[in-house]
């Protein structure tokens, strides 16, 4: 996982600027993990702010270029990293796929949407990491399709011990 102090601080400033980070100590939020917390980060609203969206995509692209030199595909974790992941893949001129939380029950019953070939190397983009369970599940889905994980990057990471 990538962690650049400058980019982390700038990203937090941007998220605060667009009110993506909410605080409510009196009435804690329930996260997807089931944890209760006085803080909630809604990265989905980044897509509604073109200047912020561009900056965050640039940060992610810079970090991927700096850290991973040999990869074939960008994979976004559904649903929060689909939009940003696709924009980053476009910026890097790489193919994009996304990983569903659950395999489709109809059609081709895919867990991964988009074109890929076996043994391709993948950089995974996650919108937010708290416990890391959705990131781990996404990586396991990619591995089960014979894709190789080069690394994982996120917009926001709580850096809880459980996610490391």
Q: Which residues does each PLM region occupy?
A:
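Conserved PRPP/pyrophosphate-binding segment of the phosphoribosyltransferase/PRPP-pathway fold
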Residues: 47, 51-114
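PRPP/pyrophosphate-binding module of the type I phosphoribosyltransferase fold
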Residues: 103-164
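Active-site-facing substrate-recognition patch
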Residues: 1-68
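Generic non-transmembrane alpha-helix signal with a bias for helix starts/N-cap capping motifs
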Residues: 8, 81-82, 135, 160
């Amino acid at each position: 996982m990538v962690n650049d102090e400058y980019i982390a601080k700038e990203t937090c400033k941007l998220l605060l600027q667009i009110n993506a980070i909410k605080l409510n100590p009196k009435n804690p939020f329930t996260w997807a993990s089931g944890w209760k917390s006085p803080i909630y980060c809604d990265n989905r609203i980044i897509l509604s702010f073109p200047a912020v969206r561009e900056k965050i995509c640039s940060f992610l692209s810079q970090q991927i270029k700096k850290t991973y030199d040999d990869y074939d595909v960008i994979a976004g974790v559904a649903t929060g990293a689909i939009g940003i992941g696709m924009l980053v893949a476009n910026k890097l001129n790489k193919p994009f796929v996304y990983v569903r939380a659950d395999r489709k029950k109809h059609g081709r019953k895919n867990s991964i949407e988009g074109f890929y070939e076996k043994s391709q190397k993948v950089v995974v983009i996650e919108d937010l990491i708290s416990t890391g369970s959705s990131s781990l599940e996404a990586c396991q889905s990619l591995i089960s399709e014979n894709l190789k994980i080069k690394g994982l990057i996120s917009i926001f990471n709580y850096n809880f011990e459980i996610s490391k």
